[in-house]
Amino acid sequence: MYLKTLELHNFRNYADLVVEFGSGINVLLGENAQGKTNLLESIYFLALTRSHRTNSDRDLISWKTKAARVSGSVQKEHTVTPLEINLSSKGKNAKVNHLEQSRLSQYVGQLNVILFAPEDLSIVKGSPAVRRKFIDMEFGQMSSKYLYNSAQYRSVLKQRNQYIKQLQFNPKGDQVYLDVLSDQLAAHGAEIIFQRIQFLKKLEKWSQEVHKEISQGKEKLSFQYVSPISSDQADTTEKIYAALQALFQKQREKELQQGKTLVGPHLDDVRFMVNDKNVSTFGSQGQQRTTALSVKLAEIDLMKEETGEYPVLLLDDVLSELDDSRQTHLLTAIQNKVQTFITTTSLSGVAQQLINEPHVFNIDHGVLMQSKEE
């Protein structure tokens, strides 16, 4: 698949933009703070209905305007699918083929993207929350079931936390309702954990191949899903459900003391291991970057395997963060098969010998012009 056209109206610093992209390499060239990252953000938003930079959709609407629109057309095989998201103070709606979708989870998956930015190096050395978000965003594009269970889990988790706080002020309150919420949370949580583990097994397989090539066979990469639920309890959703139920009962007194849910997939983590050592703790910066790059490149082939289509790759100023060897592995992996958007302040930072006839766009204060320098 590839993004054929993009239209922006009052999105960030773009008042009105209509552009047609190439199916291969698209280079977004410009000085800092001109709108390169904003353009990538709009593509990410068109794919996932949310930004990777802010949790507030209001931040995406241009200053002193009340609404924004992001739309585009996605080419798949012999079909072109129009996509559109409208934003306002009242919320947002998403359309596929000009038909509004009743749930955003029905929309996600029409355009699949993989974003690689400097901060993505933190999927290895960052907090567990960063890694959970990584799993949720990437796997969510491949599985509507995962998106559904995640949304339901968040909703029930919010209700359960609110009720636990009520019980703090009223210890003699009805705990039967807490049992009901615990049951619902365990059901959705079991689905999430099981699907995460299956997803990580597949991602691990692809990541190991890439990592072996980059490290020239000197290192072995592996993943560990970190949860209070042991691996022998996690091979079926039924076992995970039972384990979560037991943990909720065990932690109830502490939860009532602290006023929140203390176990569940919203607190789990992923550990990246190189030669059986936690690379976030014991790995060098080079090993951490190789691991992050391996995981990101593996996503491309995994998404192709799961969806039948290669995703669109967004590289936001990431080439400057990679040495020549890792940059070469990255660009070689995507050459001639993945539509790619690269932001850069200079073409000298892009390995020209690896890019076949790129489309170059100059960006200046939210105005985009296609360059003749191609």
Curated annotation (Swiss-Prot):
What Pfam family is a match, any one?
SMC_N
Official protein name in the record:
DNA replication and repair protein RecF
Question: Do you know which Gene3D superfamilies this protein is assigned to?
Answer: P-loop containing nucleotide triphosphate hydrolases (3.40.50.300), RecF/RecN/SMC, N-terminal domain (1.20.1050.90)
Q: Which family does it belong to?
A: Belongs to the RecF family.
Chief localization: cytoplasm
Q: Say if the entry is tagged with keyword Cytoplasm.
A: yes
Q: Where in the cell is it found?
A: Cytoplasm
Q: Which UniProt keywords apply?
A: ATP-binding, Cytoplasm, DNA damage, DNA repair, DNA replication, DNA-binding, Nucleotide-binding, SOS response
